């Protein structure tokens, strides 16, 4: 508040020296009451002072309002608004008076949405702002007076914007009658005439309106609040006029607009126009409708005039409607809309400037007949729209279409009456350009003009405006109907245009973009952006909203193309716009608009009519022409800035569309991942496909495949495709100026810029999550690993998601591969290690391998028991843990036998798969009394199959049903064997058999890399875990000692722990093989410590396990791990020499160590660890996606170093290991 700070100090709650002691309670009460009363009196005094201050402020505000109103009236009379007749002036005066009478209400209603603007009121404005405002007002006044007076005559002579001024002068007598046309406000004609005069300089006329509007849209918001009058819409409207001079600096010339904005310091409007980041800028520009018209008249020749217009327009949007200033009042509501409506837009709309001039010559008739939009600009706010239109993508074009076309558009988009169609179409088209609120204003204006939906629209507008203006607006709209339908029909369209321009601000989506724009564009000095946008959505949303949004996007694209010319980054938006074209097709349901856009420059009235409403909603169909011919310089420039910032600011209507803010809404998952990732999904995604097609056809973007949807370069893809579409078909087809092609290229760069933040951001997180999987070369294995992981634990589930998503990312985000590979290695390892029932997934993934593996194991098991220990035990455990966790009941018998294995599954769970489980079970069954080497070999192979499959069966039932059917069949066999095993269990012989098997694991290793990895890895790990044999032995021994049940209970517990930790353990085991080996044997080890000792002693001959300590085991394990990773990885696709040839060699080489130890206990636990490592490595290598370095130190190391996810997993695994290792140790 401006009030001076008042401090209320309690005078004396208690007198310092009370006359008498406070002996009684009543004395204290009296004293307290007295002090309280004193304080209340003091407060009352302060309140009175505040009220007086407020009264003074209100009086000053009223005075300012009156002066502003008078100024506005004078300005209106000066403006070249033929649409505004004396009636309109009177109406506006009446509206202003009513506004003054309702000053308080208006102020309140305004203050709600203008609250931010109020900050700039004289009371709260910073000195710098005050100076700017003063300068702006002076500039506006001088510019409006001098330029409008001078150019007024000039316009008549030259037929430029000031011709509109002439018209405005004529209508001045009847401004009230055209109050309904306020939307078309005469300013539009002024602008349009200005544009017409500048038709030769396409950039000047359209850019003028664009610049002014853009500038106004952005800055006017601030200005509206800055000016004391802005509180009331009327006052604001006049302020807009006065501010126009300031905004005038926002040149109308297409590209100069930026320069003008910067040079002139056109307040926020200029900067906003320069920096299209803010949707507000566009809106503000749009806002300058009425003033724009004035300014354009005066500004026809000079950018200053245009800026003035823009400023006026901006201010006016704040409260223009309340004043009902001129025919713009309708527009006035959306002051920015008027700006949009300015002839510049129309002029650009009518691609040929000459036609525009021609229309300008006979402003009312010519404009109307030529194209509703243009006729409107010429008659109403031609200059304003012109100025704005250029900058606002293609609004002018759309509106430029003939009234008939406009009508059809209007009917289609807004479903308004065709009779009002001419002006309506403009409005419809305007909404595409204008953000939602702009569209709403257009609707309101058009409806009154058309009379069909005038009541509803004006009401809505009024409600949204929250201003007394609304009633005036309705009246204006009503009178505007005649105006719109007659020569003013063009004016009405002009209004639409002006609205269209603001829509351009929110071109992306009527609903989505509008809100974003309103929010993002603080330019909502007038709440209309949001509220009106909502209105617009309501009114036109059903018909127009989507189409408009789509068209807006298209329009944005078109403009973006131009902007691309100016700046490479804008092309990004252009891309979105192009994508919008596809989006338009789906939403608008009119593919022609895209194609027609080039054709339906303002020149093609038909196209505009049929294509204008929707494409213009996007603003692109019209814009390309408008942009290239007139507004290319300015509009391109302005839009470029807008698009540039658009990447950052998603809420820019066009920018945001291009950026993908709105696009997300439309095409969240349409075609391009980047579209998805980026906020431009809705607009860009739908168009994304089209843009891709276009891209393929035109390959607009320089380093990107045109047809590529490239998730990582979604924007770039969008940019490529959309840009070509807009620039080639629209710009080249309709208006083939060099700017179109130029735009396309710059657009692509912008798109790329936008891409990294949107698509890259989105992708990177997702990619990271699924880094390992995406890199995985074989999705099946990866997925199976993921599935297994899910079985094993929570981590598994996460991995699964990663796997699925990762696969997508792998395909989608090849650009991100560098990152993904790093993560993939560690992640893949973690995945493999994690998968508890890896064998199961492996079966699914490599069912043939599994089928083969059992046979191979059996075959090999008979001749060579070596294979069994390495991988066989671990996978069964892994499956078992899932089985135990998921189906404890189904695995009871097996548990006894599997319990020993249970410790191992965590290690072998990675992808020891069937072979490992079989081997593991084979090992368990080997203990059968029958011949350990040979007899056991068959028994083992059978038992292992059953064992492996039993755990698999339970796990497969839980996780994959059907994959493990055979194992279940074996499970029955396993039952007896398991029982036999406890009896037969001579763990020593079993261990020996395991060693032998581990030494000769060719069958299993030969299995698919993942499957083999477990066997070989366990074999290698057996050597590593030679000191650990007890752990695996302990599980086996546990079966013996516990005979199933005890082991089952303990094993189940341990398995439960391991199952939970198996995914972790897998990665951890690689990190610390000993730990993993210890883990499996924690409970089992305790259960079977004696037998483990025996086993170890017996296996010592093969391995130096007997005297090994835990540290020794760790050392051995790590060493063996390195060997496995080092040896087998380089030699084999399956790291760890899973292949039968590598496997046998490695197993044989390491079998001396691992056979006895691994067979005893390390065989199961260490082998499982090694198997996991090998499996993991095999998976990594198999998934050639991430060619795993053959010389990997260890999965754990890789995980720790490369993947944060892996690091997390390792940490968890380490915890599990510690838990298990401590007990086992």
UniProtKB/Swiss-Prot annotation:
Basic and acidic residues bias locations: 852-867, 1082-1093
Region described as Disordered: 161-180, 193-213, 291-371, 466-510, 543-632, 670-766, 812-1009, 1042-1093, 1128-1203
Biased composition (Acidic residues): 841-851
Keywords of the record: Phosphoprotein
GO biological process, one term: cell differentiation
One protein family per Pfam: NHS
Positions with biased composition (Polar residues): 291-315, 339-350, 710-730, 812-827, 939-968, 1054-1065, 1138-1155
Residue numbers bearing the Phosphoserine modification: 500, 576, 691, 1054
InterPro entries recorded: NHS-like (IPR024845)
Compositionally biased tracts (Low complexity): 675-688, 1156-1166
Biased composition, class Basic residues, residue ranges: 552-568
Domain of life: Eukaryota
Family statement: Belongs to the NHS family.
Protein known as: NHS-like protein 2
Native organism: Homo sapiens (Human)
Lineage: Eukaryota, Metazoa, Chordata, Craniata, Vertebrata
